[in-house]
UniProtKB/Swiss-Prot annotation:
PANTHER family: DIMETHYLADENOSINE TRANSFERASE, DIMETHYLADENOSINE TRANSFERASE-RELATED
GO molecular function: 16S rRNA (adenine(1518)-N(6)/adenine(1519)-N(6))-dimethyltransferase activity; RNA binding
Reaction catalysed by this enzyme: adenosine(1518)/adenosine(1519) in 16S rRNA + 4 S-adenosyl-L-methionine = N(6)-dimethyladenosine(1518)/N(6)-dimethyladenosine(1519) in 16S rRNA + 4 S-adenosyl-L-homocysteine + 4 H(+)
Gene: rsmA
Protein's name in the database: Ribosomal RNA small subunit methyltransferase A
Recorded superkingdom: Bacteria
């Protein structure tokens, strides 16, 4: 699979002094209609605690900051971070955090009165670990809006009994309510990537509708069975569960992992916990 790092830029990258680099797979979003649609989906309001991950050349940052009292951006590239105040209206509203989002403690940006609204265009190669890193701060996050390759978004929002359904589907849906919002065609980027992208929303549950006894056990079980998704649960989980675990969980041991609901995965993982 090709990896594309999305940096939003409604202008000509060369005019901005930043050339798309092939080795990083950078593709710059130039379609103003798509940018406007993203902002409408986020629907920022004065008083919102908005955090943008990877602002790049600020094409999304600019319309966002026009709707907010304040905007915090997390940018790893020092050169891009240094140029942001000159690229946005109301630079006095902008707070720039030069940090690796994968390691950053987002809790320090939130308060009880102002949970985070996180926005970003995530490169595929860090999207999964970054999503799970952000979920560590789920109790401090109101919602998240991201753009990724459509196939990844399809996996996040997938339902049981589909080929897209897997570990990412189960674990994201355990913590959040995901919503597929809209596709972004390759032609919206310069240069155009070879994949279609999509924008989606995640809303962390304030109270999870289904709670596992041990979330690490759930993650371990789900990850294990989907690495062997063609095997039956009995064969895949041999040695991990007691003989009567399937009966206690009310699950057919001959089923395959893609047929199980989130609730069934939780019931099965609970059998791993004394």
């Amino acid at each position: 699979m090709e990896v594309f790092m999305y940096q939003i830029n409604a202008l000509n990258p060369k005019e901005e002094g930043h050339k798309a680099r092939k080795r990083f797979g950078q593709n710059f979003l130039h379609d103003q209609r798509v940018i406007a649609k993203i902002v409408r989906s986020v629907n920022p309001r004065p008083g919102d605690n908005v955090v943008e991950i990877g602002p790049g050349l600020a094409a999304l940052t600019s319309p966002l900051i026009g709707e907010c009292d304040a905007l915090t951006v997390v940018e790893l590239d020092r050169d891009l971070a240094a140029g942001l105040p000159d690229r946005v209206p109301h630079p006095e509203r902008l707070t720039i955090v030069e940090a690796d989002a994968l390691k950053y403690d987002f809790s320090q940006l939130a308060t009880q009165e102002s949970p985070l609204r996180v926005v970003g265009n995530l490169p595929y190669n860090i999207s999964t670990p970054l999503l799970f890193h952000l979920l560590e701060f789920g109790d401090k996050v109101k919602d998240m809006h991201f753009m990724l390759q459509k196939e990844v978004v399809d996996r996040i929002t997938a339902e049981p009994n589909t080929k897209e359904y897997g570990r990412l589907s189960v674990m994201i849906q355990y913590f959040c309510q995901p919503t597929f919002l809209f596709e972004v065609p390759a032609g919206a980027f310069n240069p155009p990537p070879k994949v279609t992208s999509a924008v989606f929303r995640l809303v962390p549950y304030k109270e999870k509708p289904i709670v596992a006894k041990d979330e690490k056990a759930l993650s371990r079980l789900v990850g294990h069975v989907f690495t062997q998704r063609r095997k039956t649960l009995r064969n895949s989980l041999k040695g991990m569960l007691a003989d009567d675990a399937f009966d206690k969980a009310g699950i057919d041991p001959m089923a395959r992992p893609e047929t199980l609901t989130l609730a069934q995965f939780v019931a099965l993982s609970d059998q791993m916990v004394p």
